[in-house]
Amino acid sequence: MVKDEPLSDESADVIVLADREEDDICELEHLRKLFIGGLAPYTTEENLKLFYGQWGKVVDVVVMRDAATKRSRGFGFITYTKSLMVDRAQENRPHIIDGKTVEAKRALPRPERESRETNISVKKLFVGGLKDNHDEECLREYFLQFGNVVSVKLLTDKTTGKRRGFAFVEFDDYDAVDKAILKKQHAIKYVHVDVKKSIYNLDKKEKQQPGGLANAIKPSLNQQQQQQGGGQQPPNGNMQAPSFRPPVPPQQAMGPYQQQPPPAPMSAPPPNFNYWGPPPPAMPPYYQQPPPQQMNGWGPYPPPQQNGWNAPPPPPPGAQQWHANQWGCPPPVQQVPPVGAVPPPMGHNGPPPTAPGNWNMPPPVPGAAPPSHQQQSSQQPTPQPNFGTGYQQNYGGGPSKHNNMNANRMNPYSAGPPNSYHTPQPPAYTGYNAGPLPPNGSVPPPTGAKAVGVSNGSVATGGSANSKYRR
C-alpha cells in the first residue's frame, strides 16, 4: 500500500501564491463583472454563485429585485477577482441555470450603460483613423487577441482607388466585440485608432421599418374611411365633396301661403359635374333635406356667380330658367292653399320681405301693388341678373355699360339713390317680385312727405313744400 507523500515546502509555497494571486484585485471592476440576463423568477444569489464559481472566485453576486414587491427583475451581476475568469466563463457558453438558458455578457461601466450603441450585441467592429501603412494583415493580427477574426475589409474610393481611412473587422462571436470595446485605447503601428461597434446596418433597417409600416397602414386606413363613410365616393371633376359641408337646416318658404314640394329621390351626380353652377334641368338637387329658399341672397352659402361674372349666356325664351338667388336648385312649384287655411309659422330668420329680389334691385314704386307670380311669369319670362344702375348682362359673361350718362360711375354695382330722376333700364327691374315699369315721363313722388299739394295733375314741389315739413 502506497502512502501519500507529504508535500514539500516548495510545492506548498506555490499553492499559497496561486491562492493569493486569485485573491488579489488589481483590475477595474467592469473588466471582472458579468451581466446575467433572462433569469428564472425563483433563481437566487446562492444558485448564481454556485454555478459561476466553477470558473473562478466570485467576490460579489446580486439578483436585481423590485423595491416594493421584492420579486426578481430577471437579471443580475457576477463579479470575479480576475478578468481572465470572465473569459473562462464566456468560453463555456451556453449557461443553463435552474433549467433556463441565460444570457451572459460583459458588464459595461455605469456611465456607458445608457448608451444605445454599447447595449447592442453585434459581431462587427468599425475601426477609424487608419493611415496608409495600415493593411488588412496588421489589423487581423491586432484583433486576434480579442477573438477569432472572420474578415477584415478596408474601404477605398471607387474613383481614385485611395483608402478612405477606416475598415470593418468581423468576429464569429459578439463577446469578442464587447471585449474589444471595453479596452478604451487601441494603438496599431504606433497610431491610436478609433474602435466602435458597427451599427450601420441596424440603423438602415430601423429607418426602413417606419416607412414600411406607414405604407402598410395607409391601405387599412383608406378601407376604414370607406367603411365608416359609407355611400358612394364623389366622382372626379369640379364638384366639391358634399360630405365636408355641414347640413343646411330647412327654412320657411318665401310667402306665408307657399308650400314646399316633396324632394326628389336621391341619385349620385354624373362625372365632371360642376357643383357650384346650376345643374341641368333634369338633375334633382344633391342633398337629402329640402332645398332652402334664399331671402335676398342672405343664406349660409351665397352663390359664387351671383353677379354673372364668367357665366354662360342666358337660355332662349321658353326654357326652364334658374334664378341667381337659388343655389343650384330649380324654382319651387307654387301652390295656392284653400280658402280658410291657416298659414304655417314663420322661420327662425323672422318674417320674409315683401319682395325677395336681387341685392341691387331698385325699390318698387310706392302705391303700386305687386303682381302675382303668374302675371310676372307671363309678362317677363326671362329674368336677367341685376348688375346695378346702368349695367346689364353681356353675352360674353361680364357686365356692359349702356349710354345712360346719369348712372353712378363711382359705385356701379350698388343700387341707385331712391330720389334719382333718371329712368333705369328694364333689366334693372326684373327682380323676382318687382312691380310693373312706371310710365315714361312720370316723376317719382318725394319721400318722407305725408301730403303733397296737387295742381293741374302735377306734383307741387319747391321750397314751400319742403319748409312745411321741416322741423
From Swiss-Prot:
SUPFAM superfamilies on file: RNA-binding domain, RBD
Keyword Repeat: yes
Feature: compositional bias, Low complexity: 222-238, 370-381
UniProt KW keywords: Developmental protein, Differentiation, Repeat, RNA-binding, Spermatogenesis
Bias type Pro residues, positions: 259-293, 300-318, 329-369, 436-447
Residues of the signal peptide: none
Record domain RRM: where: 32-109, 123-198
GO molecular function, one term: mRNA binding
Region (Disordered): 221-471
A GO BP entry: spermatogenesis
SMART domains according to UniProt: RRM
Polar residues: bias regions: 401-411, 455-471
PROSITE patterns: RRM (PS50102)
PANTHER family referenced in this protein's UniProt entry, alphabetically: RIBONUCLEOPROTEIN RB97D
Function: Required for spermatogenesis. Could be required to process a specific transcript essential for spermatogenesis.
Protein's name according to its UniProt entry: Ribonucleoprotein RB97D
Protein's organism: Drosophila melanogaster (Fruit fly)
